[in-house]
From Swiss-Prot:
Subunit a, of the mitochondrial membrane ATP synthase complex (F(1)F(0) ATP synthase or Complex V) that produces ATP from ADP in the presence of a proton gradient across the membrane which is generated by electron transport complexes of the respiratory chain. ATP synthase complex consist of a soluble F(1) head domain - the catalytic core - and a membrane F(1) domain - the membrane proton channel. These two domains are linked by a central stalk rotating inside the F(1) region and a stationary peripheral stalk. It comes from the Eukaryota. The chain crosses the membrane at residues 5-25, 68-88, 97-117, 136-156, 189-209. It is a multi-pass membrane protein. It catalyses: H(+)(in) = H(+)(out). This is ATP synthase F(0) complex subunit a. It is found in: Mitochondrion inner membrane. Its main location: mitochondrion. GO terms for biological process: proton motive force-driven ATP synthesis; proton transmembrane transport. It comes from Balaenoptera physalus (Fin whale). Component of the ATP synthase complex composed at least of ATP5F1A/subunit alpha, ATP5F1B/subunit beta, ATP5MC1/subunit c (homooctomer), MT-ATP6/subunit a, MT-ATP8/subunit 8, ATP5ME/subunit e, ATP5MF/subunit f, ATP5MG/subunit g, ATP5MK/subunit k, ATP5MJ/subunit j, ATP5F1C/subunit gamma, ATP5F1D/subunit delta, ATP5F1E/subunit epsilon, ATP5PF/subunit F6, ATP5PB/subunit b, ATP5PD/subunit d, ATP5PO/subunit OSCP. Disulfide bonds: none annotated.
Amino acid sequence: MNENLFAPFMIPVMLGIPITTLIIILPSMLFPAPNRLINNRTIAIQQWLTKLTSKQLMNVHSPKGQTWSLMLISLFLFIASTNLLGMLPHSFTPTTQLSMNVGMAIPLWAGTVTTGFRNKTKMSLAHLLPQGTPTFLIPMLVIIETISLFIQPVAWAVRLTANITAGHLLMHLIGETTLALMNINLFSAFITFTILALLTILEFAVALIQAYVFTLLVSLYLHDNT
C-alpha cells in the first residue's frame, strides 16, 4: 500500500469543507437524553458511568469544587467516546489534532486559574515563588514559575495528542507488516497478528486512561484553586 503513514490523522474534508466539527459532535449522539421516566439499559449504563466518574474525580473537592462535577464528567465521557470511536477502521480521531486539544485545554486551564486568583489570591501568587528562595534568585524563579504556569495547558494537550497518535501509528505499522508477511511467511504473519491484537486491546485501555488522566489533571488543578 502506498498510503501516507500520517493519512489517518489528516482532517477529513467533504466538498471542500472540513467536517471536524461534525465528527466532534458525533460522540454526543451516543448519550441521548431519555424521553421517558422508565429506565432502560442505556440509561442505566449512563447513570453508572456518571456515578463512577463522579466518585473517582470529585471526592477530594470542596463544596465549591463539586459544582464543576457535571463539566468534568462530560469532559471525561467526551474524550473517552472520541478516543474509542477513533479505534474503528478508517475513522478519524479528533484527539490526534494538537490544535483541538490545545483549544480544549486552554479554557479549562484558564477557568481553574481564574477561580484560584479569585478565591485564593494570596495562595495563587505564593505558588509563583517557592518558600525559602534566596533573594537574588527571586526574579528568575518568578519568571520560571510564570512560564511553567502558562505551559500547563500545552502540556495537557501534547500528552493527549502524543499518546493517542503513537498508539495509532504503531497499530498501523504492525498491520502493514502483517499484510506484507502474509505473502512471505505465514507463521511470522501470525505472530505479528497476535501482537497487533494485543496492542489493539492495549490501545482501547489507553483511550480510556488518557481521557481519565486529562480529566484528572483538570480536577487536581481545580482542587488546588478552590
